[in-house]
Amino acid sequence: MNLREDKKWAYGAGSFLRDAVGQRPLMMYAPVQTDKAAESAAEINKELRAVIGAKPLTHAEIDKIKASRVRALPGSYETTGAVLGALSANQLYGRPDDYVQTLKARIEAQTDAAVQAAATQVYRPDALTWVIVGDLERIEKPVRALNLGTVQVLDADGKVVR
């Protein structure tokens, strides 16, 4: 929200965890102005570190997240394909048959402490792989200056250029 509402550098930004057997990738995205690519990455890094450090999620933030997840539930099962996908996911991930029916209550039952503990476990800023796309001539130097890790430049086919 900071990149969009406070800084006005992006139309939107978000994150999500992909369902997976084993490790679940945390995906974050923020299409930003080219001239703010490095500053935006720095801001995301700062926010992640704050959430697991000096500025944990507030009760209001957690309630907003839970309410959003609950409100999205009906739309997640609008089509037969979506229902079939949910049933398949239940099988794949070893979920009980009543997983969908109990999901709302389980979301609402999450305590602030449990959500914060999960955030602390999932958000590992030093383990992130950053993929920053943009005008190389304009963003390479400031992105490298962030020292987020080894910088590789890839071509349009994903081959390492340098």
What annotation goes with each model-predicted range?
Residues M1-G53, H59-D112, T120, P125-V133:
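M16 family metallopeptidases and their MPP-like homologs
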Residues D112-T120, R124-R162:
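Proteolytic maturation boundary segments
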